[in-house]
Amino acid sequence: MSKENKTTDFGFTQVPWEEKQKKVAGVFHSVAAKYDLMNDLMSFGIHRIWKKQTIAKSGVRKGDNVLDLAGGTGDLAYKFCQMVGQQGKVILSDINSSMLEVGKEKLTNKGCVGNIEYVQANAECLPFPDNYFDCITISFGLRNVTDKDKALASMCRVLKPGGRSLVLEFSKPIIPLLSKVYDEYSFKALPFLGKIITQDAESYKYLAESIRKHPDQQTLKQMMYDAGFDNVEYQNMTGGIVALHIGYKY
């Protein structure tokens, strides 16, 4: 099937392959200004614990080059700036200009300057040299990428030998009762909160649907192997609602 006739998931809807990126962009242009507030409300603040665990597993040291991909408002990038010091460098990258602007303003106001750059880029074709980064993270961003396999391969290409890539993403709950409760919450509470806080229920309906369409833990693990990563492992968080996958490059 040619790309012209190919379709892909946009939540539970099938859309032409080339249209998904535009539709996802519309979602994040809409929610950017209140993204941090909604994250706190939707997860009851637990997203901060998930990100803290990701940072702890990153292995980032002073002098490292770090890519925070689909980095949005910069929660991880801010911590990495502190970890790499002035000898290192952090690149906060996002395909969405609105999210990137919010992240840049937020981190600048926090005093994060001198060792950070902001790059608008598509994860599927990263504009960086081969073997460049010591660590790459993508946090709650992979499920929004049209061609996930291509993005993972691009991440592997720009990762240094000896480096690691971390994918923090919603996944499949491993406790049946939790899965049912989570479905009820996702499909009813999230759009309601979106409507009240951002006047945009549809964007949060998409976000809930995109979580269900994202590959489960084992599938994503195999996708990372196929992309070229070594020794891929994952850790479930909050009963599998979220999983952290780590892939190395040797």
UniProtKB/Swiss-Prot annotation:
<dbReference type="GO" id="GO:0043770">
    <property type="term" value="F:demethylmenaquinone methyltransferase activity"/>
</dbReference>
<dbReference type="GO" id="GO:0008425">
    <property type="term" value="F:2-methoxy-6-polyprenyl-1,4-benzoquinol methyltransferase activity"/>
</dbReference>
<dbReference type="InterPro" id="IPR023576">
    <property type="entry name" value="UbiE/COQ5_MeTrFase_CS"/>
</dbReference>
<keyword id="KW-0808">Transferase</keyword>
<dbReference type="GO" id="GO:0009060">
    <property type="term" value="P:aerobic respiration"/>
</dbReference>
<feature type="binding site">
    <location>
        <position position="94"/>
    </location>
    <ligand>
        <name>S-adenosyl-L-methionine</name>
    </ligand>
</feature>
<keyword id="KW-0489">Methyltransferase</keyword>
<comment type="pathway">
    <text>Quinol/quinone metabolism; menaquinone biosynthesis; menaquinol from 1,4-dihydroxy-2-naphthoate: step 2/2.</text>
</comment>
<keyword id="KW-0831">Ubiquinone biosynthesis</keyword>
<dbReference type="GO" id="GO:0032259">
    <property type="term" value="P:methylation"/>
</dbReference>
<dbReference type="InterPro" id="IPR029063">
    <property type="entry name" value="SAM-dependent_MTases_sf"/>
</dbReference>
<keyword id="KW-0949">S-adenosyl-L-methionine</keyword>
<comment type="function">
    <text>Methyltransferase required for the conversion of demethylmenaquinol (DMKH2) to menaquinol (MKH2) and the conversion of 2-polyprenyl-6-methoxy-1,4-benzoquinol (DDMQH2) to 2-polyprenyl-3-methyl-6-methoxy-1,4-benzoquinol (DMQH2).</text>
</comment>
<comment type="similarity">
    <text>Belongs to the class I-like SAM-binding methyltransferase superfamily. MenG/UbiE family.</text>
</comment>
<dbReference type="GO" id="GO:0009234">
    <property type="term" value="P:menaquinone biosynthetic process"/>
</dbReference>
<dbReference type="Pfam" id="PF01209">
    <property type="entry name" value="Ubie_methyltran"/>
</dbReference>
<protein>
    <recommendedName>
        <fullName>Ubiquinone/menaquinone biosynthesis C-methyltransferase UbiE</fullName>
        <ecNumber>2.1.1.163</ecNumber>
        <ecNumber>2.1.1.201</ecNumber>
    </recommendedName>
</protein>
<feature type="binding site">
    <location>
        <position position="139"/>
    </location>
    <ligand>
        <name>S-adenosyl-L-methionine</name>
    </ligand>
</feature>
<feature type="binding site">
    <location>
        <position position="73"/>
    </location>
    <ligand>
        <name>S-adenosyl-L-methionine</name>
    </ligand>
</feature>
<keyword id="KW-0474">Menaquinone biosynthesis</keyword>
<feature type="binding site">
    <location>
        <begin position="122"/>
        <end position="123"/>
    </location>
    <ligand>
        <name>S-adenosyl-L-methionine</name>
    </ligand>
</feature>
<comment type="pathway">
    <text>Cofactor biosynthesis; ubiquinone biosynthesis.</text>
</comment>
<dbReference type="InterPro" id="IPR004033">
    <property type="entry name" value="UbiE/COQ5_MeTrFase"/>
</dbReference>
